[in-house]
Amino acid sequence: VATTVGPYARWGLPLVEACARAGTHYADLTGEVLFVRDSIDRFHDVAAASGARIVHSCGFDSVPSDLAVMVAAREADTRHGDPLAEATLVVVSAKGGVSGGTIDSIRNQVAVMAADPAKRSIGADPYALSPDRSSEADLGPQRDVGPPRYDRRLGMWVAPFVMAPYNT
């Protein structure tokens, strides 16, 4: 099943549950960290037992950065024998627009995080989707958020990608 209907926090969990229970593979376009965390917490074990693969974040929000970092990490290892320590993705131009579902998803996440400090903490945690958060290193303050700034290495002004914290 491939679904493109957001906000996933509102519409997605029943479909994830149905797929997990039926052993049916599932893919979506979500960038909603709270939805994905809920999906993992509630249905990972069910999906694993049934053989279903639940794959979130298969859209523009995540795929280009995921693939770019994967290729860069492989190259760092192949060329230098070292793991990739840091990556910066710069998008100079893009075409397309933002759907009403995306706007509604953003509104929903902002409202939920504003009302619930625990959810806000999840939304701000770059390891929120880690299967074992306690084993992850503390990297200190993340540079994925903040105001536009001039990047001397790139020689241009840059601003964080709205999905950068999620993709971290």
Q: Where are the language model's segments positioned?
A:
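Adenosine-phosphate binding glycine-rich loop
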Residues: 46, 50-94
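Active-site-lining helix/loop region of Rossmann-like oxidoreductase modules
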Residues: 74-168
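Structural motif
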Residues: 3-4, 29, 57
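Rossmann-fold NAD(P)-binding glycine/threonine-rich loop
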Residues: 12, 30-52
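Hydrophobic beta-strand scaffold residues
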Residues: 1, 25-26, 54
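ADP-ribose/adenylate-binding Rossmann-like module
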Residues: 7, 18-37
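Rossmann-like NAD(P)-binding element
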Residues: 1-10
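Alpha-helical structural signal in soluble globular domains
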Residues: 18-22, 42, 46, 75
